[in-house]
Regions:
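Blade-loop segments of beta-propeller domains
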Residues: 58-83, 88
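Canonical WD40 repeat/beta-propeller blade segments in eukaryotic WD-repeat proteins
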Residues: 19-33, 68-76, 118-132, 166-176, ...
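A structural motif specific to WD40 beta-propellers
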Residues: 18-21, 60-62, 116-118, 158-161
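Intrinsically disordered, low-complexity acidic/Ser/Thr/Pro-rich linker and tail segments
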Residues: 1-56, 87-89, 93-116, 183
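WD40 beta-propeller blade core
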Residues: 50, 61, 93-98, 149-150, ...
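Conserved beta-strand element within WD40/beta-propeller blades
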Residues: 32-34, 40-44, 83-92, 132, ...
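WD40 beta-propeller repeat blades
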Residues: 142-194
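Hydrophobic/aromatic beta-strand positions that recur at structurally equivalent sites within the blades
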Residues: 52-54, 76, 95-102, 132, ...
Length: 194
């Protein structure tokens, strides 16, 4: 049975929040839900992301901190009780991923300006990417321009190491091991484990 519902209808949700991209203002299907503590986050296919109060079901705020921000992914970081948003921007032709970490208590108080940009030294233009590994408390980024993979600590976002090898095609992280999958060479194994 239905336990509750959340609504981002314009009458309730968009008043006082300016989003210049018209598609952010239209209803679209929910592609991701993250819930922790007293907050529920709903990310729409359009890129609009709303935070709701679990207690009241009411809209707390939209997480789109900039008017042209399209949020593509959410990650709850239990290491520091924050929500990481991965976004693209119209002003950049939606080309570069930008990450921001905002403490949940700041979101509850509608203080989105307390969010901190992450991985600002990285150029995460497509086909670059960022992946979050909750089990190992690691973040993997790929800077496609420089062909560099970097691993960061999820606790404090410091860089742990980087891998510069044009033959790496994929990286898998498991507890205590990192698997590098390389382009196959003649008479050489196609993978290394670190």
């Amino acid at each position: 049975s239905l336990q509750g519902s959340y609504d981002t209808s314009p009458a309730e949700g968009l008043a006082g929040h300016q989003m210049t991209l018209s598609f952010l203002q239209r209803r679209s299907r929910i592609v991701e839900i993250v819930a922790h503590g007293g907050l529920v986050f709903a990310l729409a296919h359009s890129g609009a992301c709303a935070a709701f109060s679990r207690a009241t079901g009411g809209l707390v705020c939209f997480l789109n901190a900039n008017e042209d921000e399209v949020i593509r992914s959410l990650f709850y970081n239990k290491q520091n009780n924050s929500l990481i948003t991965v976004s693209v921007y119209a002003s950049d032709n939606f080309c570069t991923l930008k990450c921001r970490s905002t403490p949940l208590e700041c979101i509850a108080r509608k203080e989105l300006d307390k969010g901190v940009p992450l991985f600002t030294s990285e150029s995460l233009k497509w086909p670059g990417f960022v992946e979050f590994d909750d089990v190992n408390a690691k973040v993997l980024t790929y800077n496609a321009c420089d062909k560099v993979y970097k691993v960061f600590d999820l606790r404090d976002y410091r860089e742990l190491y980087q891998i510069r090898n044009e033959k790496v095609t994929e990286i898998k992280i498991s507890p205590g091991i990192m698997l590098l999958i390389l382009e196959e060479e003649e008479k050489a194994p196609p993978q290394d484990a670190l």
